[in-house]
Amino acid sequence: MQSNDVNAAAVNGKEAAYLGVPWEDAYGYAQAIKVGDTIHVAGQLSHDEKGNLIAPASLDESGKPAEFSMMEQQMRATYANAVKLLARFGATLDNVVEETLYVLDVDAAFAAAGKVRKESYGTARPQCASNLIGVTRLAFPEQLIEITFKAMLSGAEAKPR
């Protein structure tokens, strides 16, 4: 299902959205699924429409991130990808009720998150539950962050499109 646009397919009462990046077919999954009035967004990362990592971390000789200065840029691009997927279902970040940030460096993530989350959600106190979890590895060596989202539609938004 390769494409540069957010594609969608409906099967068994589930509506799926894709970004057209290579790993969707390689791994075999949808970027987001809408069931009823709930949208589940799979782990998003900082990539462009062709699947190239945005603001990749520099790596040390062992192939691990040498520093975490790109955390803010990666976080911002990750939220932008989530916005694209949510829009496919008529939702925005205002509909997000829970997010989980998986990060390689908790301190760098905390330093970036205060600013980026407030900008992304457009408020000083985003109205969603948020989890920040330190992990030892993500999908790509240069990747510093991955975020999953759960969003709820209500009223007119929940009607089939």
Question: Which residues does each PLM region occupy?
Answer:
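N-terminal presequence-like segments and the immediate start of the first folded domain
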Residues: 1-80, 84-97, 103-161
